[in-house]
Amino acid sequence: MNHLTAHKREYTRNRGNLYLAFELGSKEWKLGFSVGFGQRPRERVVWAGDLVGVRREIERAKKRFGLSGEVRVLSCYEAGRDGFWLHRYLVHLGVSSLVVDSSSVEVNRRARRAKTDRMDLGKFVSMLMRYDNGERKVWSVVRIPTAEQEDSRQLHRDLVAL
């Protein structure tokens, strides 16, 4: 076994983590689950804001991948109109959550294909695994404001909109 093979085996080994990427839409949320590189993510859909559905799908994914109930769950989603309440809920569930600056997500400029949720979920899950394996330049993680800071920002946005 040469150095590159050894590195690849180490990089793709399942360390017992469940990775979860969200694609947040206005009507539905798409969830992509994986336990390691080299596999397509398990994709599920819940209604937007359905926290019971999110929790249920996390538990189903643990069972599907044969993971214990106490397995480390890492999640990510792009910062946007939904704010940070989803992050707070996930942390409350014991999920390690990252909110990603959408402008920092790498894009293949040569690709002449449309952006789709399926590509986004697969890419997000892969990038989350890369980030977890120490590749910090994959994207920029947003600093999470306190609930009070977020509320004051929202009040300001509402006043500007009027």
Predicted regions and their residues:
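Phosphate- and other anionic-substrate recognition elements at nucleic-acid/protein interfaces
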Residues: M1-L162
